[in-house]
């Protein structure tokens, strides 16, 4: 097989319909466009969202909210998720490699949700009061 010999399967393609070539073709004179009007002219059609002069929907509805740029930079982590990591010394890089936080995250905070039974050392990770108590109760430590 060569690139210059490749062809579509028999019957897979159809010739384009020739319009404006006489009454007998079924698509003569107006060529399937109907009579007069903007849509019958060449190059004549309204822009997307145009509603004939009526105020378009995208302008009738109010603007609402915004996308926070800091939302993707911050993440929360549960105590029970720390339990699943095999390493004892945990920092943001370890969490990214474990797939617990997104690669765009730069700030992580551990919240007191779930339980932890092994001692872990957190580096550069913020914790809530309840999470700090739970981690230190099992012999873990938190470094900033």
Curated annotation (Swiss-Prot):
* Classification via Gene3D superfamilies: 3.100.10.10
Cleavable signal peptide? none
Q: Which GO terms describe its biological process?
A: translation
Checking SUPFAM superfamilies in the record gives: Ribosomal proteins L15p and L18e
Instruction: Provide the alphabetized UniProt keywords.
Output: Ribonucleoprotein, Ribosomal protein, RNA-binding, rRNA-binding
Gly residues bias spans: 21-31
Region (Disordered) residue ranges read 20-49
Q: Name one GO cellular component term.
A: cytosolic large ribosomal subunit
InterPro entries to which the protein is assigned, alphabetical? Ribosomal_uL15 (IPR030878), Ribosomal_uL15/eL18 (IPR021131), Ribosomal_uL15/eL18_sf (IPR036227), Ribosomal_uL15_bac-type (IPR005749), Ribosomal_uL15_CS (IPR001196)
One Pfam annotation reads Ribosomal_L27A
Q: Does the keyword Protease apply?
A: no
Q: Which PROSITE patterns match?
A: RIBOSOMAL_L15
Gene Ontology MF: a single term? structural constituent of ribosome
Keyword match Transmembrane: no
Oligomeric state and partners?
A: Part of the 50S ribosomal subunit.
Q: Which family does it belong to?
A: Belongs to the universal ribosomal protein uL15 family.
Question: Any idea what job this protein has?
Answer: Binds to the 23S rRNA.
> Which PANTHER family has this protein been placed in?
50S RIBOSOMAL PROTEIN L15, LARGE RIBOSOMAL SUBUNIT PROTEIN UL15M
Q: What protein am I looking at?
A: Large ribosomal subunit protein uL15
- The gene from which this protein is expressed is rplO
């Amino acid at each position: 097989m060569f690139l210059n010999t490749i062809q579509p399967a028999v019957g897979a393609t159809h010739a384009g319909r020739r319009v404006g070539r006489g009454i007998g073709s079924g698509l003569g004179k107006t060529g399937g466009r109907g009579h007069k009007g903007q849509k019958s002219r060449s190059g004549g059609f309204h822009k997307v969202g145009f509603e004939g002069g009526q105020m378009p929907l995208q302008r009738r509805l109010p603007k609402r909210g915004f996308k926070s740029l800091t939302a993707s930079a911050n993440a929360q982590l549960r105590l029970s998720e720390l339990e699943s990591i095999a390493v004892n010394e945990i920092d943001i890089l370890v969490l990214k490699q474990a797939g617990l936080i997104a690669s765009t995250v730069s700030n992580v905070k551990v919240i007191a949700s779930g339980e932890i039974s092994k001692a872990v050392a957190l580096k550069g990770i913020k914790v809530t009061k309840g999470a700090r108590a739970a981690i230190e109760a099992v012999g873990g430590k938190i470094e900033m």
